[in-house]
Amino acid sequence: MMSMEGPFLAAVIARLADPRFNLAAHGVAFAFALLIEAPVIMIMSASTALVEDRLSFKRLRAFIYGLNGIVTAFQLAILIPPVFRFIMLDLVAVPEEVADLAYWALWILLPWPGAIGYRRFFHGILIRDGRTRLVALGTGVRLVTMASTGLALFFFLQPPGAWVGAASLSLGVLAEAIVSRFMAESSVRKLLATEGVTADSVTGDRAGEELTYARIWRFYYPLALTSTIGLAAQPMMTFFMGRAIAPVESLAVFPVAVS
């Protein structure tokens, strides 16, 4: 279902003013948002594997809150105007018209990494509890919210297309995060009522041993590194296209092609 987001938003942006610049800015902003969220994207695997009682739930929840704060602060640092202009204009070398649109799109995408980490934490809890259908339901809520936001902005306000794409993605994932928390309520109650640690085929810890932050970090950092390396490809392609022939056209067609 999530694969429908890209083609839908590209179609909406292409029908608004200045589609060439806005498709390019949407692609640039989304590429950087993906890279920023990369460290939190594997939290679902961590919560599926590690959360088995009250203590492990609270420890991993605190860990993901801290990680969400770090990636959000990193995005805020990128949005400091001199830093942003250095990255976009000097390093990536995107045209200034594209950079200006991408700047505000990244502001609109500010809730994106934290909401991704939050909802994937609760997705893992749902999966561990065997309630996988609710994960699909949450994705459906995300798609409906994303599409409704995009269409409402298209028909009633018609802001720049890059901002429409960013707002649709942000509101969609925020809606999914909120719904996932409510859907996981009964699973969370069961975890909070469970004392002690049962064992662990995944981490290899001894039965009865607490899940410490050090163990969470040892388990999680290879996953975070894997997702960061994998998702770095799109920003790298943006870097090369910004310095290639016809950069605006290349940046505009790239999000359409990969969607």
Label for each model-derived stretch:
Residues 1-4, 106-110, 136-140, 179-182, ...:
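Hydrophobic faces of transmembrane alpha-helices in multi-pass small-molecule transporters and flippases
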Residues 3-24, 89-96, 154-158, 224, ...:
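Helix-terminus/linker motif at the lipid-water interface of multi-pass membrane proteins
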Residues 25-76, 119-127, 254-259:
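Small-residue-rich hydrophobic transmembrane alpha-helices
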Residues 27-30, 68, 106-109, 113, ...:
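Residue-level recognition of transmembrane alpha-helices
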Residues 41-48, 108-127, 135-142, 164-181:
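Short runs within selected transmembrane alpha-helices of multi-pass transporters and secretion channels
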Residues 73-103:
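Short membrane-interface helical motifs at transmembrane helix boundaries
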Residues 96-119, 259:
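Alpha-helical transmembrane segments of multi-pass membrane proteins
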Residues 105, 138-152, 156-192, 196:
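Hydrophobic alpha-helical transmembrane segments
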